[in-house]
Amino acid sequence: MFRWFDVSYDVANTALIDDHRYIFVANHPFGALDGMMLADMLLRRWSDVGVIVNDLLMHIEPLRELWIPVNKYGRQHSAELYHQSMRSATKQLLTFPAGMCSRWVDGRVADLRWQTRFVKDAEYYNRLIVPIYVDGTLSSRFYNIYKVRRALGLSVNVELLLLVDELFRQRGTRVKIVVGRALDLRSMRGGVTECATLIRNEVYALRRFIPQQQAIHSAIADKIW
């Protein structure tokens, strides 16, 4: 699939112990592309991997075996599969707490508000959390449409209609991925919201390992209205 889209990725990572159970937590700059890349990265190390997604994505048949649906619409099967995966002794899990791809926020590309469920589940199911930073941007067109929509007070995410085209615009891209150290919630202070904020900060702190990262975002910033 990556060869067909002419995209690839490089990974800088810390040593992870294979027999731990992890929840990998990442930012979401591209949408589908980063999910596929991170799933591929994890499958190169572990044979049993699940990606936590909106249960509507279960209709994408080629990747269905990877998906772990969030019970967003009250579907009993989704809830059972989700908790079964969390309890699994072997399955490594990947989640994007923002639930949607990044937008232009405060002068740079960043996720919108993170959901905190991953913190509760990591604590309840005794999983370590591994922060991952994926470096990348969509086109300035995507972010400008988002800004215009917000300015007009429209609640419908019309910019999402561009995501397929944005995927093809990534042709020839080599994405940088940084995997951080595993975090144990037992060593973190604060409630669920505070822990989620700390972990989000850990994710974005990893971008310091990306050469010329600031230059990439500055080039996009020059085209934002």
Predicted feature residues:
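A transmembrane-helix-recognition feature enriched in membrane-embedded lipid enzymes
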Residues: 1-5
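Soluble catalytic domains of membrane acyltransferases
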Residues: 8-184
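C-terminal/domain-terminus segments
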Residues: 186-225
